[in-house]
Amino acid sequence: MRILDEAVIPELPNYYRGKVRENYDLPDGNRIIISTDRLSAFDQILTCIPYKGQVLTQTARYWFEQTKDICPNHVVSYPDPNVVIGKRLDILPVEVVVRGYLAGTTGTSILTLYKKGERQMYGMSLPDGMKDNQILPEPVITPTSKAFDGGHDEPLTPSEIVEKKLLTQEQWDTLSRYALALFRHGQEIAAKQGLILVDTKYEFGTDENGTIILADEIHTPDSSRYWMADSYDESFREGKRPASFDKDFVRAWVGERCDPYKDAVPKIPEDLVLQTSQVYIDAYERITGQRFVPDDSGETPLARVRRNLEPFFPGV
């Protein structure tokens, strides 16, 4: 299988490895961000999915273009299907998740906490009697601390964010306003494609002037949960998990076999890997309304990325 499992390019400066992305800080204040095919969930890498990195980059490109009038973003250029050149930002230490439904499988999801009996969370209150995957009265923000050291994200309330001096009140007000506006616009566009944008994660940073800017990715199958709109009502009535366009079913496969936060995760079978690859491709086409064009250059993905990034090598 043609996969980009890593993108270590020695000629590029200031390398930093993220969960699924390789980063290189350039002298001009920009950053090279390469999306690999690594699939991350439960704070670990589960496997690699063919074309996943290209889907993420191109889906984010579509959404950054759709939302540039709502919130400034980090995009400078796209030299390769898997690569974005972005402004280098000081990433804010709060991860912002916006949720429109009582859903999720992670330890910080409102459904997980709700099933544990919690009703007060993230500075809000939920009533008794709600069902799995039920729509919320209105979208809510569920912020968590950003685990820069590889630890687990921890739930936060808006007041805790300010009290702990993670953000100023003004920063939180701006960030939350952006997040809700981005989410509502995303839901509107997704609905036109027959999809429900269930929840999503945003990452923000500040530039040299302190301006808050959207970073990382937006409304991709990795950062978001999508359901098929035409089957949601029936699935909800029958208590079934809605048909999804994201990595949620891989999470579900793992969750049925172990506690991924405590146990060793079993190897993901090849048929599930290929199925997941097709899900990512289908998601791109359904979300954007555009046909996915895989690379057919004959090169390995790493060789192609390297060639397209040669203009950024020092001294070139």
Curated annotation (Swiss-Prot):
Keywords: ATP-binding, Ligase, Nucleotide-binding, Purine biosynthesis. One of its GO terms (molecular function) is ATP binding. Pathway: Purine metabolism; IMP biosynthesis via de novo pathway; 5-amino-1-(5-phospho-D-ribosyl)imidazole-4-carboxamide from 5-amino-1-(5-phospho-D-ribosyl)imidazole-4-carboxylate: step 1/2. It is an enzyme of class 6 (ligase). PROSITE patterns: SAICAR_SYNTHETASE_1, SAICAR_SYNTHETASE_2. InterPro entries: SAICAR_synt/ADE2_N, SAICAR_synthetase_CS. Its EC number is 6.3.2.6. One of its GO terms (biological process) is 'de novo' IMP biosynthetic process. Belongs to the SAICAR synthetase family. This is Putative phosphoribosylaminoimidazole-succinocarboxamide synthase 2. It comes from Agrobacterium fabrum (strain C58 / ATCC 33970).
